[in-house]
Amino acid sequence: MNQELDSKFSKKLRGVNLGGWLVLEKWMTPSLFEGLQATDETSYCVELGVQAEPALKKHWDTFITAEDFAWLAKTGINAVRIPVGHWLFGADYPYHPAYGALPHPFVEGGVAILDRAFDWAEQYGLLIVLDLHAAPGCQNGFDNGGILNVCEWHTQEDYINYALLILERLAERYHNKPALHAIEVLNEPRWDIDTQLLKKYTTEAYHRIRKYCHAKDVAVVYHDGFRSFREYTGFLTEPEFSNVVLDIHRYQCFVQTDIDLDIYGHIRSSVVDWKNEADDIIQDGHSTYVGEWSLGLHLKFVSLWAEGPFTDTLQAMDSFQKSLAYRAYASAQLMTFEKYSGWFFWSYKTETTPEWCFRECVNRGWLPDNFANEALGQDNN
């Protein structure tokens, strides 16, 4: 990495995701879905029809505000990762059968909200990682990909090409914004999508973004696709490619062997297994973000696709012991994730799940109340 690039991007990102805002997730904002059969943003817009517009615009205006950016800056957070859907720029996206009789069901106007987020970020000194979270046809079958139980993004050239077009539009629109730090080409493509297809897409995405965003100004980020980082050894490396970041997501609540751990096992996984993994990833030459992590230890209120039973490792603890456990688990993860170039808690705000709500974790004392360099390691009481 050249000296100019190294200087700008040596700053460690300590961030949060602004999930559930411009891409809906039912578990994060259940009040929006009350009385509906909808499970994701697609079915939400299809079911509500014209009524979706006032509901979503109210949500966009109130769920995240300038006050939230101010609070994050005060707390020492220096970056936000903002998930966006392929429908962000309006109604020219390809049709999917899930839309039914509506050729373009999604509510328009999200791009103006994103414009406002850039203004707030600049005002309060936060950096932004833009994240294509929901691609046409859905890339993972999760609700956060736009269509639950559908994974067809990789099966049609129209879907793939439109995702690339959205990345190019994002780069063109925001390349002059001081807050733009990185663009992520696709969130969590499913584990069974061919690695070579993902590499081809990511390489093309890199070139599309670089048409407007120079390497000295903006990083290009790609997710590991739920496979070993070793499958990307030597991928998109210098000198032909520059300022490329690998994104990994680390949770201990989606696999039964993790869910069955007691709190000591969760802590050990964080400070031993994940620490050793971090050393290996760094040794392999990858600049890396942990783009998502949380304090979640079970899926009872979170997952629409996982089946129970949902073991709660803290169920037998009293409130004081639970607080200790969450603080220890948070510290264990942070000790490891600080080895990377940056991390982003999932998510900043939820309605009902404090373990997944950064602001609530801070308020409850599970996470530090100041993440600025000068505050770390000091008594902030």
Language-model regions, residue ranges each:
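Extracellular glycoside hydrolase catalytic/binding regions
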Residues: 165, 172, 179, 186-331
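Short loop/turn segments at strand-loop or loop-helix junctions that form parts
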Residues: 16-19, 83-85, 249, 292-294
